[in-house]
Amino acid sequence: MEIERKFTIKELPADLDSHTCLLIEQAYLNTDPVIRIRRQDDDYYLTYKGKGLMAREEYNLPLTREAYEHLLPKADGNIITKKRYLFPISVPSFREGYQPESLPSLTIELDVFEAPFAPLIIAEVEFPDKEMADAFLPPDWFLADVTLDKRYHNSNLSRMQDPASLQNSSSLQDPSFLQG
């Protein structure tokens, strides 16, 4: 089970380049149900995702490079390329009254999308359970919680007719660029 929340951000952190960075390329063989192929640095995966916005089933199967390259031309829609920066959260904040049984190890996955999706930037945080996800208080540099907005799901981005229109957005946080 994957349980995650998604956020837009106010600005890129100043220490961005001091964090681990993964290079990701992904494409969708199907979007209902979601069947995705991904290259993450030198690793390759086939992923099935069930229905849901914050919580859903997810299964990852390793692929060889040859299998990935064979499947890539069969993908529908746009290929998504992004840099993922990993920010460990040493002491996460939670709403008043929520106390986790143990201090969780959480990580912000900051996805900086490349063309044709630039300037889109999305922060994701995965949780061990839904209760913790609901109680999580995001850091100050996060802006809007877009977890329940389907437009921010990569499978929907892959189907955008005109991803170049994202470049005309006046704001990284403005969700209007995802319309159309």
Each predicted region: which residue ranges?
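Phosphate-end processing signature that detects enzymes handling 5′-triphosphorylated RNA
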Residues: 1-180
